[in-house]
Amino acid sequence: MTPPPADDTSGKSGRRTELLDIAATLFAERGLRATTVRDIADAAGILSGSLYHHFDSKESMVDEILRGFLDDLFGKYREIVASGLDSRATLEALVTTSYEAIDASHSAVAIYQDEVKHLVANERFTYLSELNTEFRELWMGVLEAGVKDGSFRSDIDVELAFRFLRDTAWVAVRWYRPGGSVTVDTVAKQYLSIVLDGLASPHN
């Protein structure tokens, strides 16, 4: 009796993931416009035409990279906010999760930071604007609740605090290197210490 043909779904899935990883690295290093399909194919050791067996365009690769990263990130954000932690603990968890994302999805974060302003003009990427709005609502909500319950100072401008947190946390993708001498846990703890407790020593 002839055995049924082997299911190569897992093999195709693994190859697809490998190609996305290669593309993400190139997009992060060179930028989307400067990276061609041929560049990706060359880095993967295949012909350009073979890449189209897996993806119909360069944009579809970018879309899949960003959706995977953002779906995971926002799923964690929503769980944190819904968990019932106090305001300070919630902010700490949001910041830590953000740094963990920079560590785990470094190329995807770099792509997002570099390209989001251009991508949102493309109908395919309208979800990026929606997630930006949700990000603002989640983080602003935590800050406002913290001011109200006394976790955070009442004299802070919540809007400015939000912008400061958003920009200073994510800019770490420019200098943080996964696997380097400084761990993501150390970076997150130092950042939170500076933000929540300040740089100056307590007065005696």
Curated annotation (Swiss-Prot):
DNA-binding region: 36-55
Stored InterPro entries: Homeodomain-like_sf, HTH-type_TetR-like_transc_reg, HTH_TetR, KstR2_TetR_C, Tet_transcr_reg_TetR-rel_C_sf
Keyword Repressor tagged: yes
SUPFAM superfamilies: Homeodomain-like (SSF46689), Tetracyclin repressor-like, C-terminal domain (SSF48498)
Residue ranges of every copy of the HTH tetR-type domain listed in the record: 13-73
Pfam family, one: TetR_C_24
Keywords recorded for this protein, A-Z: DNA-binding, Repressor, Transcription, Transcription regulation
GO biological process: regulation of DNA-templated transcription
GO MF annotation, one: transcription cis-regulatory region binding
Subunit-structure text: Homodimer.
Function: Controls the expression of a small regulon that may play a role in the utilization of cholesterol.
Protein name per Swiss-Prot or TrEMBL: HTH-type transcriptional repressor KstR2
Species assigned in the record: Rhodococcus jostii (strain RHA1)
Phylogenetic classification of the source organism: Bacteria, Bacillati, Actinomycetota, Actinomycetes, Mycobacteriales
